[in-house]
């Protein structure tokens, strides 16, 4: 997630395993894109130095030489009125802060969810098990709902849960699951409670809510629904890039993608005397889809919005956008008031507000239902 001025408040991180990054890993070079058409070969340490300075990027090392720029997006007509209020409100009533607190307590207990190490693989495996349990508990597996790993050339895998609809066109909700200790990426403690354990468990709870609707559960919604948990976001949007590039190559149609990156920290707004609000990202997103998201928030959520800019390649919605798919992102706050503990060993659950996370879950349920049903 984008750092910007939050970096100035970051706590000192601690390395607990005592090992250093191997010399050959430091010497390895990666091709990154910092802005459209602006590329650079860097070492891994140079990647983290850019991140520490608040500079985000796509890691495009695995793309073919001569990669293409962002693909033009097709014009998609989004609903201009609310159509499923009764169904959405019934699902919202089932959302549980206790579920999210339980899930996030476990997810942030892993030493780290860094994408290159075994802990990151373990956290992804545990998370996928929770997704499978949600599908099975709802009985959605009997109607074709499933969860699958999306493998990469590093330890952590991405996760895709699919609820079939009458059309193969997909409505996507995504969140990255990896964490990082920027002082010591390979070995440092990185609980990642807010960045992005909060987003991961928020969309998991929203999945549980969506599966309460029998029309959706039984595969009778107009469109297919997918929930994504991306690996390797902190290293340059690796997991989401791979998934949306695959979708582009295979011709998959995506009606819209909503990204949830950090959903739980409100203290920055409170300390500034601001009303607790969503941060609506306005750059590198689809304007029409974002307008639809605003309508959903107005109808189903109890907090207002503040417009904010996130920058190029700041989170996984940018991967959808770059591959020609309309995307939107809603953050926990304006970008300059994000959780100052992100990317450190202090990104703990104690700083988060689960009522705020429930508001994000309401948004997701409304977004998915109004767009897919």
From Swiss-Prot:
Pfam families: Peptidase_M28. Binds 2 Zn(2+) ions per subunit. Its EC number is 3.4.11.-. Glycans are attached at residues 196, 288, 348. Disulfide bonds join 310-314. Residues 1-18 form the signal peptide. Zn(2+) 1 binds at residues 176, 195, 261. Its cofactor is Zn(2+). Optimum temperatures are ranging from 40 to 50 degrees Celsius. It comes from the Eukaryota. The keyword Ribosomal protein does not apply. Induction: Expression is strongly increased during growth on protein-rich medium. Expressed at even higher levels when keratin is present in the protein-rich medium. Optimum pH is 7.0. Zn(2+) 2 binds at residues 195, 234, 343. Extracellular aminopeptidase which contributes to pathogenicity. Belongs to the peptidase M28 family. M28E subfamily. This is Leucine aminopeptidase 1. It comes from Trichophyton rubrum (Athlete's foot fungus). The gene is LAP1.
């Amino acid at each position: 997630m984008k750092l910007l001025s939050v970096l100035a408040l970051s706590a000192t991180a601690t390395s607990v395993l005592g090992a250093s990054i191997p010399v050959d890993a430091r010497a390895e070079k990666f091709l990154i894109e910092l802005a459209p058409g602006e590329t650079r070969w860097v070492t891994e340490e140079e990647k983290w130095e850019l991140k520490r300075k608040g500079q985000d990027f796509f890691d495009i090392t695995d793309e073919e030489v001569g990669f293409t720029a962002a693909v033009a997006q097709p014009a998609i007509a989004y609903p201009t009125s609310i159509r499923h209020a009764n169904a959405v409100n019934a699902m919202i009533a089932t959302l549980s802060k206790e579920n999210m607190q339980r899930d996030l307590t476990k997810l942030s207990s892993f030493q780290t969810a860094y994408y290159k190490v075994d802990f990151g693989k373990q956290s992804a495996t545990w998370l996928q098990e929770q997704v499978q349990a949600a599908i099975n508990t709802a009985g959605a597996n009997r109607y074709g709902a499933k969860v699958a790993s999306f493998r990469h050339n590093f330890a952590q895998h991405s996760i895709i849960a699919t609820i079939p609809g009458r059309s193969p066109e997909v409505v996507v909700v995504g969140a990255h699951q990896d964490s990082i200790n920027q002082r010591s990426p390979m070995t440092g403690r990185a609980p990642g409670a807010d960045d992005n354990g909060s987003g991961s468990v928020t969309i998991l709870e929203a999945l549980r809510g969506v599966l309460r609707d029998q029309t959706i559960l039984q595969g009778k919604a107009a469109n297919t629904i997918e929930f994504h948990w991306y690996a390797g976001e902190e290293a340059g949007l690796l997991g989401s890039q791979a998934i949306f590039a695959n979708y582009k190559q295979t011709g998959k149609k995506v009606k819209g993608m909503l990204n949830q990156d950090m959903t739980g920290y409100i203290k920055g707004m409170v300390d500034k005397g601001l009303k607790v609000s969503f941060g609506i990202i306005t750059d590198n997103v689809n304007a029409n889809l974002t307008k639809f998201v605003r309508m959903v928030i107005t109808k189903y959520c109890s907090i207002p919005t503040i417009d904010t800019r996130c920058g190029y390649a700041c989170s996984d919605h940018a991967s959808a956008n770059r591959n020609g798919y309309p995307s939107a992102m809603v953050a926990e706050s304006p970008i300059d008031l994000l959780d100052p503990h992100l990317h450190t060993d202090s990104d703990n659950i104690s700083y988060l507000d689960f009522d705020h996370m429930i508001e994000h879950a309401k948004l997701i349920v409304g977004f998915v239902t109004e767009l897919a049903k």
